[in-house]
UniProtKB/Swiss-Prot annotation:
GO terms for cellular component: membrane. It is found in: Membrane. This is Uncharacterized protein C330.19c. Keywords: Membrane, Transmembrane, Transmembrane helix. The chain crosses the membrane at residues 32-52.
Length: 90
């Protein structure tokens, strides 16, 4: 049986407490990173979509405003065909 005096016991207790704090901080950082992964994936998915819509709507004369009906009108009247050219049917 190992007998510790008060200062050794206090030192060990303090070291365990510091280790526990480090583990908790690492766990918190890991938790934050894990929670951010879906946001990063969502951002990575929507960035090309937003870029496409921005360039698509910039070419549309009808959808100059941010109105939903203008966007739908733009999508209806300016549909790209398979060759990549713009079909403008007004």
């Amino acid at each position: 049986m190992v007998v510790l005096n008060k200062s050794e016991a206090h030192d060990r207790s303090r070291k365990l407490e510091l280790l526990s704090i480090r583990i908790n901080i690492f766990g918190l950082q890991l938790n934050i990173i894990i929670n951010l992964i879906p946001l990063v994936l969502l951002f990575a998915f929507f960035c090309p979509c937003i870029y496409f819509l921005h360039t698509f709507l910039a070419d549309c004369e009808i959808a100059k405003s941010t109105c939903i009906t203008s966007v739908f009108n733009c999508l209806i009247f300016h549909m790209p065909n398979l060759s990549g050219d713009w079909n403008i049917t007004v």
